[in-house]
């Protein structure tokens, strides 16, 4: 009996020792530190919510984003049916007109208009709609257009980031590993590209090739790979003479296998951080182009085009500017919080900071 108890205690001690000495991977360590960063977690959950909204936008119970109804133009945000909002607007306008003309009763024409509107509200199902965030100049639902606008903006940011990563990571890895004249030629090309006016090139491409969502993210991505190319090149140069690379080389591994199988996986941390920090830059670039009238074409909408439309009537209809601007600002802040958290999580120097 005593022997069994000692054996059990010994096994328990061995298990506890194994748990303590169990190696922790980079990803486990990064996730552990990320969970301790409250702002990064808020950013992660917020970004996740936005992406889910963008992915499942067609399944959401919102009105079609392109549907127009001119009887409902410029309705303010409200929980009431559109007919009630329309009627209250007309009453408020008529009351101001009566005060200006110093009269206390409706005219016959005004009574007839009110009766016609009330009959229309009772019979027309469109007046039973609820526009929680109001409508625009064509009677389109602002909530629906903000959701679908986010879908376009996030897609442009995501596709632009993926394209920039593909070009920048590939060229940076090849330049860093090959060295010599290949490295010099590629880096001189990067230096030349850095000297060119980035936004001017994008504007010229959009003006020549037309307003197309595919052209838009390609135009942005083709100029945005320069930074990640330099970062990856520096990482590859610092790693290419490591022992694990020498071991792979001695076993006959090709240069391509060493780059993509051994070196790039060790740079994934910095690549992920770059992705989360560059995506807001793509969205801001798209918004700037939309503000200049070079964004997506109607009836499509992005956050940038919605903000551009909202600026035109911001004094009379402030919700047309504030709602898409707030939606975009929250997403950009969330991406930056997440990017900062990931940077701290993957940075070994930040272990004692979290």
Please state what every model-predicted region is:
Residues 1-165, 169, 313-323, 327-334, ...:
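Gly/Trp-centered helix-boundary motif
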Residues 135-354:
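Alpha-helical transmembrane segments of integral membrane proteins
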């Amino acid at each position: 009996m005593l022997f069994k108890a000692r054996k059990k205690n010994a096994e328990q001690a061995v298990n506890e020792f194994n748990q303590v000495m169990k190696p922790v991977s980079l990803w486990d360590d990064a996730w552990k530190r990320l969970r301790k960063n409250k702002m990064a977690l808020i950013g992660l959950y917020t970004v996740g919510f936005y992406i889910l909204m963008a992915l499942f936008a067609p399944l959401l119970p919102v009105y079609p984003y392109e549907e127009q109804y001119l009887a409902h133009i410029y309705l303010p945000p409200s929980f009431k049916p559109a007919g009630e909002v329309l009627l209250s607007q007309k009453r408020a306008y008529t009351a101001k007109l009566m005060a200006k003309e110093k009269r206390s009763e409706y005219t016959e024409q005004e009574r007839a208009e009110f009766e016609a509107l009330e009959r229309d509200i009772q019979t027309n199902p469109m007046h039973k709609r609820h526009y929680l965030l109001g409508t625009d100049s064509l009677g389109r639902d602002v909530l629906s257009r903000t959701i679908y606008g986010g879908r376009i903006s996030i897609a442009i940011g995501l596709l632009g980031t993926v394209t920039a990563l593909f070009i920048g990571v590939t060229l940076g890895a090849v330049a860093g590993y090959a060295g010599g004249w290949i490295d010099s030629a590629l880096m001189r090309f990067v230096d030349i590209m850095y000297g060119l006016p980035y936004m001017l090139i994008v504007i010229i491409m959009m003006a020549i090739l037309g307003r197309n969502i595919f052209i838009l993210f390609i135009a942005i991505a083709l100029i945005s790979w320069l930074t990640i190319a330099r970062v990856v090149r520096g990482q590859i140069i610092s790693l290419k003479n490591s022992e694990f690379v020498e071991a792979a080389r001695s076993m006959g591994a090709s240069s391509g296998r060493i780059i993509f199988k051994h070196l790039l996986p060790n740079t994934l941390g910095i690549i992920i951080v770059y992705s989360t920090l560059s995506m807001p830059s793509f969205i801001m670039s798209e918004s700037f182009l939309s503000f200049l009238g070079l964004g997506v074409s109607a009836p499509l909408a992005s956050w940038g085009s919605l903000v551009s439309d909202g600026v035109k009537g911001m004094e009379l209809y402030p919700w047309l500017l504030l709602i898409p601007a707030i939606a975009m600002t929250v997403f950009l802040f969330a991406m930056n919080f997440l990017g900062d958290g990931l940077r701290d999580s993957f940075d070994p120097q930040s272990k004692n900071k979290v």
